[in-house]
Amino acid sequence: MSDQALSTFDRAREALDKKTRYVQDFPEKGVLFEDLTPVLGDAESFAAVVDAMAEAAEKLNAEIIGGLDARGFLLGSAVAYKLGLGVLAIRKKGKLPPPVVTQEYELEYGTAALELPSEGIDIAGKNIVLIDDVLATGGTLGAARKLIESCDGHVSGYVLAIEVPGLGGRDNLGARPVIVVRDPQ
C-alpha cells in the first residue's frame, strides 16, 4: 500500500476508535454492540470512513456499489457518490414493489430474505462491491452475493467498516476479497 493509502485507513481507524459507542449486553446478554451512529453523525469521522471505503472499493474494480439495508445504504451511497458510481440498494424483504428477485438466508432462529428489483437495473456482467457497516456472521452479505449472482452480476469483493471477531463471517462470503477498515479487536 502507498503512504497515502495508509494515511487514509489510519484516519478512518482513528475515527472509528474515537467515535464508536460500545453498548454491553445489546441486543442480548453477553454481546458487546458497536454502534456506529456517532461515527456517521460526525462529519469528519464519516468522511474519513467513506474515504477509506472508497479507496478499497476502487481497488476491487467496482462498477456499482451495493449497499445493504440499512447502514450499508448510508455508507454505500456516500462511497458511490465519491467514486462517481451508481448505488444498488439491497433491501430487506417486503420493502420493494413487485416484481423482485429474492434470496432467502438462515438466521439463528428462522429465515430472512433480501430483494432487488427485477426490472429497471441491469447488473449483468458488472463488478459490484458490497458495502456494509459490520461483518458479523456473514449471512446477510453471503445472501446479497447470491442475490447479485442470480441476476448475473459479479461481486468483486466486500468492504466493511468493522468486523466482529470469532463469528466466522468470512466463511460465508465465498472466495472474494474482504477489506475491513478497522481490523477486529
UniProtKB/Swiss-Prot annotation:
Enzyme superclass (EC): transferase
Alphabetical list of CDD domains matching this protein: PRTases_typeI
Gene Ontology cellular-component annotations: cytoplasm
SUPFAM superfamilies assigned: PRTase-like (SSF53271)
Key words, A-Z: Cytoplasm, Glycosyltransferase, Purine salvage, Transferase
Catalytic activity: AMP + diphosphate = 5-phospho-alpha-D-ribose 1-diphosphate + adenine
Signal sequence, start to end: none
Keyword set includes Endoplasmic reticulum: no
EC number: 2.4.2.7
Keyword Ribosomal protein in record: no
One BP term from GO: adenine salvage
Cellular location(s): Cytoplasm
Pathway linked to the protein: Purine metabolism; AMP biosynthesis via salvage pathway; AMP from adenine: step 1/1
Domain of life where this protein originates: Bacteria
Subunit and partners: Homodimer.
Family: Belongs to the purine/pyrimidine phosphoribosyltransferase family.
Record-given protein name: Adenine phosphoribosyltransferase
Organism, as annotated: Corynebacterium glutamicum (strain R)
Gene that encodes the chain: apt
